[in-house]
Amino acid sequence: MAMSRLKPSGRIGDNMKKTLGLVALFVLIVLSCFYFFPKQPKNILDEIYQETEKTYLGNNVFNKLKDVEVHKYQEYSDDSKFYPTVAYEGNALPDSYEKIAIDFNFKSEAQLSLISFEKRIESNVNIKMWTVYSHKERNLKKFIKIVLKKADTKNYIEDEDQVKSYLEKYGITAKDLDSYYDEIVNQKVLKDWCSIYDSKYSPSNYGDVKVETQWENW
């Protein structure tokens, strides 16, 4: 007597398809998290770096500000890529401050952005302060040097002992340096950023970033 072959149940086949579909969806979600999560800005400087990188070849995000000039400089020596600079116009600068600028280097392995400005101490002496932010390392370093101006030339003093000597001569303390930094970087540059971008952070809450200050223990 011939035995009839058993046929797989249609319900079992449908369940298998649903299970495989759910597994595939789960794997896709996990892979998406691994891809997108590291790209999310972890601090306010990440936001600035990433948004500028996205927009600088077209309509740079900083074009939303009225008191800045946005430039693209091309490096012909190696890769012919453009690198952006944002410079504040003279009429937008607070009294006794000069040359507020934001620069980016997307080619650098450390993925750098810099904020710089000068504080006028007297007619021929400035303090130059600047930050270097590494998008890759998520650390912000703050530096200082003295600028001596004579006619059309400038002499930069970076040796810490000499810098301290000039600061002492003009009665400038580490707290004063902190106040200069706060007035320009926090109250001007980062405040402007929050006015043109829906930031998750603020000038008083940078987010996840390690900050190192050259003059911290002076």
Segments and roles (model prediction):
Residues 31-121:
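N-terminal export/targeting and maturation segments
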Residues 12, 21, 26, 105-106:
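Intrinsically disordered, low-complexity segments of exported/surface proteins
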Residues 85-218:
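Extracytoplasmic electrostatic interaction patches
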Residues 2, 16-19:
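Positively charged n-region of N-terminal signal peptides that target proteins for export
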Residues 13-14, 112:
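Juxtamembrane/transmembrane-helix boundary motifs in multi-pass membrane proteins
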Residues 19-35:
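Hydrophobic membrane-insertion alpha-helices, especially the h-region
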